[in-house]
C-alpha cells in the first residue's frame, strides 16, 4: 500500500463517522454521475484541470499516472483504493480522470444527457467552492502520514472494505434555475359516450342485427337458385365421408358452388349429417376423422374478418328534449268519453219509462222424494227398459247365454239409502265376460273405517249467544190485555189471585188404604186393572209432595199363593245376609246445596220494611190493625205424651201414619198452595240460582225484624 493511501484512511473515517451507510451509497453514486456530466462538457473540465495544476503542481504527481496503472494491472481492489484516496485528496482531479479509467461504463440515455448538459453549465461556481474544501482536507492528511499505522491485518482488511463504500461528500443543493424549454401537457380529458348506449348512437348495420333478433321481418336478400334438402346434405357430408381420390374434382366444383351459401350457416346447428342416398352402402367411420376433412371444413368457413374500428371523434352528442309524461284519457274509460252512438240505450215502455230486466225464473228445489226417484231410475228395471235403445244382435246372443247380475258391481256406499229391486235379466246389457274382467281389475274394496261414524258438521260458526228478554219474563213486558186483574177487598188491599180448580171428591179411608197398599200386595187380577187407572189419578192429588214418612209395609194376607211364599223366603234369606241396617247420622239433616256461588247478597231497604220508611198516609192502617188484634199470644193445646215404642203394638205403629192423615179438603188446599208457591218461585227466579236463595234469606230476615218490632211496640 502507498503511504498516501494509509494517510487517507483516517481522514475518510473521520468524515464517515456521523453519516449512515445509506448516505454513503448515495454519495458514491453522486460521485459517479459527476464525471459523466463533465465528459459531456469538455471545455469546463479542461479549464478546471489547468487551475488545479497551477495551484499544486508538485504535491500530487500520482493521479496522472493512476489511470494507466489501473488499466495495466486490471485489479479492481487497487483501483478502488486509489479512487478513495483521490476522492479525499483531490476530488477535482478525480472528475477529470475517471472517464478515462472507465471506458467500459454504459453511456447514459438521451434524457439523462440533456439534463446533465444543463446542470454542467450551471454548476461551475459550485465547483470552485468544492476545490477550496478539498485543499483544506488534504493538509491534515499529509501531517498524519508521518505517524506509523499500528493496526493489525484484520483492521486493515476492514478498512479496505469500508473504503470500497466510498467517502462522504458534502451535498449542497444547487440553487440554479431551469433555463430549458417549457414543458407543456397537451392532453385534455374528453367524455366519450359508449356506443349503443342510446338508440341514436347505434350504427345502421347493428340496427339490422337487432331487428333480426327481435323478429321484425326484413326483406330477404336476392339469392341464386335455392338448394334442396338433398343438395345441402350432400354438400355437408362430402368432407365427412372417406371417398376415393377420383372424386376430388367433383368435390371442388360442388364446394365452389355451395361455399358462398354455406358460409352464413353455423356449424353448431347441424348435429348429425346423414349419408347421401347414392352412398348408403358405404360405412362412415364416426370415431376417426381424417385431418383433410377437418381442414376442408375449416376452409369452407372462411377467415374471420376483423371488425372495423369506429372513429369516435366523428360521433356527435345529440341533446334530447326532456319528454314529459302526460296521462291521456282513453275513449270509453269514463261514461263521459263514450260516444253517444255507442252508448247503451235502455228498452223504453210505451209511456217512455225504461223497462226493468225480467227476473230469471229460478228452478224449484227438488224434494228428497223426487231426488231419490231420479237417482233410483237407473236401478229400476222397468224404467230402464224404456230408456234403453234397441240392442244389437251380439248383445242378444250374450244375454241368452248368461244373464249378468249388475247389482253386485255397484258399491255399497252409493246404496246407503236406496235399495234397488232384485236384478232381473234385461235385454241390451253388457256381457258377463267384460264385466268380470272389469271387476277383476278393480280388486277388493277395503272397508272404510269412517263409514260407521256419524256425520258431523265441520262448519265453524262465529255466532255469539245474546241474552234477550222474553215476552212475559218481567211485568213490564206483559201486554195489558194479558195482565192479571188485581182483586181488592173492602179495605182496598189486593187479594192473592187463586186459580179456579175442580173440586175433589172426598175419599174414604178404606179406599185410600187400598190404593196405597196395592203395591205391597200380590199381582192384581185382570178385572181390577180398569179400577187402578181411576185410583192413580185420585191418589196423585191426595199424596203430598213432601217427603213421605218412613212406613213399614204390612205383610201379605194369608190367602196368597204358594209362589208368593217362595219369593218371601228368598227375600228373607237375602235380607238376613245383608245384616242390620245402621242408622245414618246425616239422614235427618236438611238438604243443602253444595254448589258454591260467588254472588253476594245485598240487603236493600224496601218501602214499609221499617217504621221510618212507612208513608204517613198508610200509618193509620197499621194502627187500626194493632188495636183490633189481641196482645195475648195464642194458647197452644198441650200435646199428649207419647207412649214408648216398646209399649205400642206394631199394627198401631204402622197404621198411625194413616190415621194422622188430614182430611181430603185440607190436603187439597195444601197441595194447591204448594203448587202456587212453586210456580211463583219459578217465574220470579233469576237465571243464577244464588240470587234466588239470597232473596229468600233477605225475606226471612225482614220478617224476623217485623216480628221483633211488633213485639217491642
From Swiss-Prot:
Cross-link Glycyl lysine isopeptide (Lys-Gly) (interchain with G-Cter in SUMO2): residue positions: 32
Biased composition, class Polar residues, residue ranges: 85-94, 542-553
InterPro entries xrefs: Calpastatin (IPR026998), Prot_inh_calpain (IPR001259)
GO MF, one annotated term: calcium-dependent cysteine-type endopeptidase inhibitor activity
Residues with the N6-acetyllysine modification: 50
Amino acid composition bias (Acidic residues), ranges on this chain: 370-379
Inhibitory domain repeat start and end residues: 171-223, 307-359, 447-500, 583-636
Cystine crosslinks: none
Region of interest (Disordered), residue spans: 1-187, 211-506, 536-713
Protein origin, superkingdom: Eukaryota
Biased composition, class Basic residues, residue ranges: 21-30
Residues in the signal sequence: none
Functional description taken from the UniProt entry: Specific inhibition of calpain (calcium-dependent cysteine protease). Plays a key role in postmortem tenderization of meat and have been proposed to be involved in muscle protein degradation in living tissue.
UniProt note: domains: Each of the four flexible inhibitory domains can inhibit one calcium-bound calpain molecule by occupying both sides of the active site.
Family recorded in the similarity comment: Belongs to the protease inhibitor I27 (calpastatin) family.
Protein name per UniProt: Calpastatin
Amino acid at each position: 500500500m502507498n503511504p498516501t493511501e494509509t494517510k487517507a484512511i483516517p481522514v475518510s473515517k473521520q468524515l464517515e463517522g456521523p453519516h449512515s451507510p445509506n448516505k454513503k451509497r448515495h454519495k458514491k453514486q453522486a460521485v459517479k454521475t459527476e464525471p459523466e456530466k463533465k465528459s459531456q462538457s469538455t471545455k469546463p473540465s479542461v479549464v478546471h484541470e489547468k487551475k488545479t495544476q497551477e495551484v499544486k503542481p508538485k504535491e500530487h504527481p500520482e493521479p496522472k499516472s493512476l489511470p494507466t496503472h489501473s488499466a495495466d494491472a486490471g485489479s479492481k481492489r487497487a483501483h478502488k483504493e486509489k479512487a478513495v484516496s483521490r476522492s479525499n485528496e483531490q476530488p477535482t482531479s478525480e472528475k477529470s480522470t475517471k472517464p478515462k479509467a472507465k471506458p467500459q461504463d454504459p453511456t447514459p440515455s438521451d434524457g439523462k444527457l440533456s439534463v446533465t448538459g444543463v446542470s454542467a453549465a450551471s454548476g461551475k461556481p459550485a465547483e470552485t467552492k468544492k476545490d477550496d474544501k478539498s485543499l483544506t482536507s488534504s493538509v491534515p492528511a499529509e501531517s498524519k502520514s508521518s505517524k506509523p499505522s499500528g493496526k493489525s491485518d484484520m483492521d486493515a482488511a476492514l478498512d479496505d472494505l469500508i473504503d470500497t463504500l466510498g467517502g462522504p461528500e458534502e451535498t449542497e443543493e444547487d440553487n440554479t434555475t431551469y433555463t430549458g424549454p417549457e414543458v407543456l401537457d397537451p392532453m385534455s380529458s374528453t367524455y366519450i359516450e359508449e356506443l349503443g348506449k342510446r338508440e341514436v348512437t347505434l350504427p345502421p348495420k347493428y340496427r339490422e342485427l337487432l331487428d333480426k333478433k327481435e323478429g321484425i321481418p326484413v326483406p330477404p336478400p336476392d339469392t341464386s337458385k335455392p338448394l334442396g334438402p338433398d343438395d345441402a346434405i350432400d354438400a355437408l357430408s362430402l368432407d365427412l365421408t372417406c371417398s376415393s381420390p377420383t372424386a376430388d374434382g367433383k368435390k371442388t366444383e360442388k364446394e365452389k358452388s355451395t361455399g358462398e351459401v354455406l358460409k352464413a350457416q353455423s356449424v353448431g346447428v347441424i348435429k348429425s349429417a346423414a349419408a347421401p342416398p347414392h352412398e348408403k352402402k358405404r360405412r362412415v367411420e364416426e370415431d376417426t376423422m381424417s385431418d383433410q376433412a377437418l381442414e376442408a371444413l375449416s376452409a369452407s368457413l372462411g377467415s374471420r374478418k376483423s371488425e372495423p374500428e369506429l372513429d369516435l371523434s366523428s360521433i356527435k352528442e345529440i341533446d334530447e328534449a326532456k319528454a314529459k309524461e302526460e296521462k291521456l284519457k282513453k275513449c270509453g274509460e269514463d261514461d263521459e268519453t263514450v260516444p253517444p252512438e255507442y252508448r247503451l240505450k235502455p228498452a223504453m215502455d210505451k209511456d217512455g219509462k225504461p223497462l226493468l230486466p225480467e227476473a230469471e225464473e229460478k228452478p224449484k228445489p227438488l224434494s228428497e222424494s223426487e231426488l231419490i226417484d231420479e237417482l233410483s231410475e237407473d236401478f229400476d228395471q222397468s224404467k230402464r227398459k224404456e230408456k234403453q235403445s234397441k240392442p244389437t244382435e251380439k248383445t242378444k246372443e250374450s244375454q241368452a247365454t248368461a244373464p249378468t247380475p249388475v247389482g253386485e258391481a255397484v258399491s255399497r256406499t252409493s246404496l246407503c239409502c236406496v235399495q234397488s229391486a232384485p236384478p232381473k235379466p234385461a235385454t241390451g246389457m253388457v256381457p258377463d265376460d267384460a264385466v268380470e274382467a272389469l271387476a277383476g281389475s278393480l280388486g277388493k274394496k277395503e272397508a272404510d273405517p269412517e263409514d260407521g261414524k256419524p256425520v258431523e258438521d265441520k262448519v265453524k260458526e262465529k255466532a255469539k249467544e245474546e241474552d234477550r228478554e222474553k215476552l212475559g219474563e218481567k211485568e213490564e213486558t206483559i201486554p195489558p190485555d194479558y195482565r192479571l186483574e188485581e182483586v181488592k177487598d173492602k179495605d182496598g188491599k189486593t187479594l192473592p189471585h187463586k186459580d179456579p180448580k175442580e173440586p175433589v171428591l172426598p175419599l174414604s179411608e178404606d179406599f185410600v188404604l187400598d190404593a196405597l197398599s196395592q203395591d205391597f200386595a200380590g199381582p192384581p187380577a185382570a178385572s181390577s186393572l180398569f179400577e187402578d187407572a181411576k185410583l192413580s189419578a185420585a191418589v196423585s192429588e191426595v199424596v203430598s209432595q213432601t217427603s213421605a214418612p218412613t212406613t213399614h209395609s204390612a205383610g201379605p194376607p194369608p190367602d196368597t199363593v204358594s209362589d208368593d211364599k217362595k219369593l218371601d223366603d228368598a227375600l228373607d234369606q237375602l235380607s238376613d245376609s245383608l245384616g242390620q241396617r245402621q242408622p245414618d247420622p246425616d239422614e235427618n239433616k236438611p238438604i243443602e246445596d253444595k254448589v258454591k256461588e260467588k254472588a253476594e247478597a245485598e240487603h236493600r231497604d224496601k218501602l214499609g220494611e221499617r217504621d221510618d220508611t212507612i208513608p204517613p198516609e198508610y200509618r193509620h192502617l197499621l194502627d187500626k190493625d194493632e188495636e183490633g188484634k189481641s196482645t195475648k199470644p195464642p194458647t197452644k193445646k198441650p200435646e199428649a205424651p207419647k207412649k214408648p215404642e216398646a209399649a205400642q203394638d206394631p199394627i198401631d205403629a204402622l197404621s198411625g201414619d194413616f190415621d194422622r192423615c188430614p182430611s181430603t179438603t185440607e190436603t187439597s188446599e195444601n197441595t194447591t198452595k204448594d203448587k202456587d208457591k212453586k210456580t211463583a218461585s219459578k217465574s220470579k227466579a233469576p237465571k243464577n240460582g244464588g240470587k234466588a236463595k239470597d232473596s229468600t234469606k233477605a225475606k226471612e230476615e225482614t220478617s224476623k225484624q217485623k216480628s221483633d218490632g211488633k213485639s217491642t211496640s
